[in-house]
C-alpha cells in the first residue's frame, strides 16, 4: 500500500505526497459554486508534481527519503548520498492561497546543480464522494505576471488557475499534448563543497491568471523563512505535549489533519466549511455530516482554536441549518443524501454547549440565527417523538445504515442530554423541556433495558415498542459512551453488563483476543478507530493506549477501520473527523490518569 504524507492549509490540500517517490500526486481545493472539491491530477506513471535534483548532469533518485513531519505537519524528507545531503520540504503556509516546495543540496565537492520540478496536469476532477472528470479545457501560457507560465481551466470563462514563481531566476518549459499539460521549472546553480544551495517554487491558486500569479508573488515576497516561521509558530501554539513522544506525535499529527482536512475555505467565496475529509482518499470526501463535524471533530477544533470553533458553529447554524438532521449535505447546505438521523439532529446542541462551556460566550447563544436553529431542532424533535411514549425515532443509524428498530438507545440518550441543555437556554420552556428530558430517561429504562438468559439487565441497541429489540453496537454511536454523555455512571450495573456483552469474544463483531481488540460492525467488519476512541472514553483506556502504540493506521493518521492483527488501515483512509475524535478521546484519557508512561 502506498504511504502518503498529507499536508495542507485552509485553501490548499495536498493529500498524496508519496513517501517513496517524493511526488505530489494531486492537489485539491474547495469550491462553493461547485458544492464540493476540485482535484488536479497527474497519471499513474507521471505525477502532477515531481521534484528532481541533478548533480553534474546526473539525476539523483529521490526515492527512499527519510521522512519526518516537522512541527507535526510540515513534510520533509532527506537523504545522504556519496555526492551530497539532499532535502525536500513541502510547506502549505497558513493564511496563504498556495504552497511552496523547497529543494536543498549540500554537495560534498564543487559541482553544478540543477534543481526543479516537473509534472503532468492530466485531468481535473470534481469530488463529492464520487469523482467526475471535468469537461472544460485546460490551458498553459506565458505570463508577464509571474515571468513564467500560468495553468488555467476554462468553462467558457475562467474557472481556476495555478501559477508558479521561484526564488532563483530559472527556466520554465511546457507543452500541451493529448496526455495533458507537461511542464518543468528549474534553475542551475554552482555549488561549493559543504555549502547549502536551495531552490524554492511557490505555487499560487486563484480564480484566473492575475489572482493565481499574485498569490505566488505574495509568498515569494514574504520568502520561505518568513512563511515557515509563521506556520511553525501557528502549529507550535496549538501543539499538545503528552506523556510519551509516541502519544504526542499521534495527537498532534491527527490534530492538524483534523484542523486542515475537516475544515477549509472555499477558494471562490472564501467561506469556512466543514467536511468529512478534504482528501479524495476518504470514500465520502468533501461533504458535510452533523455527527462527524460536531460530535467528533469539534472538540479538537475547540481546544485548538476557539475562534475557529465559533466560525464552525456559525456555518452550522446558517449554511447548514435548513437540513440539520439530514443524512449528509453538500458544503453549501443543500441535501446530498436524504434520510433522517436523530443523532445528527441534536449534534449542534451538544457542540454549542461545548463552545459555551469553553468560552463563556453567552452572546453567541442569543444570536438570532442560533435561536432560529434551536427552534428548528425542537420542531423536528417533536415530529420524531412517539405519540404516547417519550422515545424518539430515527430512520438511519450512526453508521448511516438503515435501522432494524426505530428507537435507538444511544440516540435517545443524546436527545435526553440535548433537552436538558435546551431547558437551561430557554427559561420560558424550562419546565416542559426538563419534564420531557426526565420522561425520555424514564422511557429508556422502561423500554430499552432487557435481560439476558441469566436475568442480568442490559441496554438494547434498538427497540420497536412492540417487544422486539436487538443486541448490537456501532462504533460511530456506541452504547459504551453513555457515561461520557452523563446518562449513567461507569459503575452502573446495566451499563457494565452491556459493555461486557459487546466486548465479549461471543459478540459477532468483537475482536476480543486480537492485538487490536476493538469492535466492528457490518458497515466495516474490522476493528474501528472510533471504537478505540470509545474505549479511551469508557474506562478501557489502558487497552486502547496499548493498541494505539502498535497501530500504523493510515501512516499515523486515523482511518475508519484497521486490520485486527497488524493495525494497518483496511477502510476509510484519511478520515479527518475521526482524527479529531481520536485526539479528543486521547487527551481525555490522559487527563483522567490512564497509564501509558506516566499519565
Where are these regions (language model features)?
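The feature captures the catalytic groove of carbohydrate-active enzymes
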Residues: 198, 202-214, 282-283, 328-329, ...
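Well-ordered alpha-helical scaffold segments within catalytic/enzyme domains
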Residues: 237-242, 294-307, 347-364, 413-429, ...
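Extended ligand-binding clefts on enzyme/binding-domain cores
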Residues: 287-290, 376-379, 386-387, 405-414, ...
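Acidic/polar, glycine-enriched structural segments that form the non-catalytic walls/loops
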Residues: 85, 91-286, 597-599
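C-terminal catalytic domain of Rieske-type non-heme iron oxygenases
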Residues: 329-333, 517-519, 546-579
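Long, well-ordered core segments of solenoidal/helical folds
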Residues: 254-266, 304-327, 369-390, 435-455, ...
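Aromatic-rich carbohydrate-recognition surfaces in CAZymes
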Residues: 284-387, 412, 573-593
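Beta-strand-rich N-terminal accessory domains
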Residues: 1-56, 74
Amino acid at each position: 500500500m502506498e504511504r502518503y504524507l498529507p499536508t495542507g492549509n485552509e485553501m490548499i490540500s495536498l493529500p498524496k505526497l508519496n513517501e517513496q517517490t517524493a511526488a505530489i500526486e494531486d492537489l485539491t481545493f474547495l469550491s462553493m459554486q461547485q458544492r464540493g472539491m476540485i482535484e488536479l491530477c497527474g497519471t499513474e506513471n507521471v505525477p502532477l508534481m515531481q521534484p528532481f535534483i541533478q548533480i553534474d548532469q546526473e539525476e539523483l533518485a529521490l526515492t527512499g527519503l527519510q521522512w519526518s513531519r516537522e512541527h507535526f505537519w510540515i513534510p520533509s524528507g532527506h537523504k545522504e548520498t556519496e555526492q551530497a545531503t539532499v532535502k525536500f520540504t513541502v510547506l502549505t503556509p497558513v493564511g496563504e492561497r498556495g504552497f511552496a516546495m523547497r529543494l536543498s543540496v549540500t554537495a560534498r565537492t564543487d559541482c553544478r546543480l540543477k534543481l526543479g520540478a516537473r509534472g503532468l496536469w492530466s485531468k481535473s476532477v470534481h469530488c463529492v464522494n464520487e469523482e467526475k472528470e471535468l469537461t472544460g479545457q485546460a490551458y498553459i501560457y506565458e505570463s508577464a505576471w509571474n515571468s513564467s507560465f500560468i495553468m488555467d481551466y476554462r468553462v467558457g470563462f475562467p474557472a481556476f488557475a495555478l501559477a508558479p514563481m521561484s526564488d532563483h531566476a530559472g527556466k520554465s518549459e511546457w507543452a500541451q499534448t493529448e496526455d495533458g499539460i507537461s511542464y518543468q521549472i528549474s534553475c542551475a546553480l554552482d555549488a561549493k563543497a559543504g555549502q547549502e544551495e536551495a531552490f524554492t517554487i511557490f505555487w499560487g491558486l486563484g480564480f484566473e491568471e492575475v489572482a493565481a500569479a499574485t498569490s505566488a508573488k505574495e509568498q515569494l515576497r514574504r520568502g520561505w523563512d518568513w512563511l515557515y516561521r509563521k506556520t511553525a509558530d501557528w502549529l507550535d501554539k496549538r501543539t499538545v505535549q503528552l506523556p510519551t513522544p509516541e502519544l504526542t506525535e499521534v495527537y498532534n499529527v491527527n490534530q492538524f489533519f483534523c484542523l486542515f482536512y475537516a475544515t477549509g475555505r472555499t477558494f471562490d467565496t472564501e467561506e469556512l466549511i466543514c467536511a468529512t475529509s478534504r482528501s479524495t482518499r476518504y470514500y465520502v470526501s468533501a461533504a458535510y455530516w452533523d455527527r462527524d463535524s460536531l460530535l467528533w471533530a469539534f472538540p479538537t477544533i475547540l481546544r485548538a482554536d476557539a475562534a475557529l470553533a465559533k466560525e464552525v458553529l456559525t456555518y452550522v447554524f446558517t449554511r447548514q441549518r435548513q437540513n440539520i438532521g439530514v443524512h449528509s449535505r453538500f458544503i453549501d447546505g443543500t441535501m446530498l443524501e436524504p434520510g433522517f438521523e436523530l443523532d445528527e439532529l441534536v449534534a449542534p446542541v451538544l457542540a454549542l454547549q461545548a463552545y459555551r462551556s469553553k468560552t463563556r460566550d453567552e452572546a453567541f447563544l442569543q444570536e438570532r440565527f442560533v435561536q432560529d436553529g434551536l427552534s428548528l431542532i425542537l420542531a423536528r424533535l417533536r415530529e420524531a417523538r412517539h405519540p404516547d411514549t417519550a422515545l424518539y425515532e430515527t430512520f438511519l443509524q450512526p453508521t448511516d445504515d438503515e435501522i432494524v428498530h426505530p428507537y435507538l438507545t444511544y440516540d435517545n440518550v443524546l436527545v435526553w442530554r440535548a433537552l436538558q441543555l435546551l431547558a437551561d437556554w430557554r427559561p420560558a420552556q424550562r419546565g416542559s423541556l426538563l419534564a420531557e428530558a426526565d420522561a425520555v430517561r424514564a422511557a429508556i429504562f422502561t423500554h430499552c433495558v432487557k435481560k439476558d438468559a441469566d436475568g442480568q439487565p442490559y441496554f438494547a441497541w434498538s427497540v420497536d415498542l412492540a417487544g422486539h429489540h436487538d443486541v448490537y453496537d456501532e462504533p460511530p454511536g456506541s452504547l459504551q459512551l453513555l457515561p461520557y454523555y452523563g446518562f449513567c455512571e461507569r459503575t452502573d450495573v446495566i451499563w457494565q453488563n452491556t459493555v461486557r456483552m459487546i466486548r465479549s469474544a461471543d459478540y459477532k463483531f468483537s475482536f476480543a483476543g486480537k492485538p487490536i481488540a476493538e469492535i466492528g460492525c457490518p458497515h466495516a467488519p474490522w476493528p474501528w478507530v472510533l471504537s478505540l476512541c470509545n474505549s479511551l472514553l469508557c474506562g478501557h483506556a489502558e487497552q486502547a493506549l496499548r493498541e494505539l502504540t502498535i497501530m500504523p493506521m493510515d501512516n499515523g493518521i486515523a482511518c475508519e477501520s484497521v486490520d485486527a492483527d497488524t493495525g494497518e488501515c483496511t477502510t476509510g483512509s484519511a478520515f479527518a473527523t475521526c482524527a479529531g475524535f481520536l485526539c479528543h478521546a486521547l487527551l481525555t484519557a490522559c487527563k483522567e490518569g490512564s497509564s501509558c508512561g506516566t499519565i
